[in-house]
Amino acid sequence: MQFDPPLQPAILLKRYKRFLADVITPDGRELTLHCPNTGAMTGCAAPGDTVWYSTSDNAKRKYAHTWELTETQQGAVICVNTLRANSLAKEAISSGIIPELSGYNQLKSEVKYGEENSRIDIMLQADDRQNCYIEVKSVTLAEKEYGYFPDAVTTRGQKHLRELMAVAANGDRAVILFAVLHSAIDRFSPAHHIDARYAQLLTEARDKGVEILAWKAELSTTKMTLNKPIAVVLNPGK
């Protein structure tokens, strides 16, 4: 995925109302950016961090600029636009980068499924195999070399795991793909210390046939690619 036109830098002043952030550009202008991230954004939004933003040519948008990346004062690069995770996953699957998800000839998005009024992020289909349901989650919370999900309690995420377990029980493939969008993360673990129920359900899902994948993105201010598998550790420290 390439950024065209290129992203522009600014210094973060503050994030507020979840969806907004004030920044100051190198030439001294103060802008308000749209923040496409409803999470806690722990470690991704410290005042003084460098942010990189895109600009839309849609005149109907109230906020023309979108916060895409954070470059922290410690040197990490993070994609904070959670909407990019699905696009990166689709690109990686279509390009054959993820071997576990290769061999399908149809890719569909936002397909209704399950008994809890859900939509699957990605469905893969082929004539000679069962359907593959893929839920994509964006990982940006870093503590030491570990990346954690979620960064806040997520009843919606818990629902998705229940739905995936039902898919596996019905004989189709069920996959949860954690898209790691933080340059300092080398391993993935569920956030027991934030949402213990989600962590418990993830282990239960694994035991009931849900496949767990974690792939790390190569991030820059010009392009992003989901291209590196990393270890999944369901119970770190044990």
Curated annotation (Swiss-Prot):
Q: Which domain of life is it from?
A: Bacteria
Query: What InterPro entries does its record include?
Result: SfsA (IPR005224), SfsA_C (IPR040452), SfsA_N (IPR041465)
Tell me, what is one Gene Ontology molecular-function annotation carried by this entry?
DNA binding
Q: Which HAMAP family match?
A: SfsA
Family that this chain belongs to: Belongs to the SfsA family.
**Protein name in the entry:** Sugar fermentation stimulation protein homolog
Species source reads: Klebsiella pneumoniae (strain 342)
Record lineage: Bacteria, Pseudomonadati, Pseudomonadota, Gammaproteobacteria, Enterobacterales
User: Which gene codes for it?
Assistant: sfsA
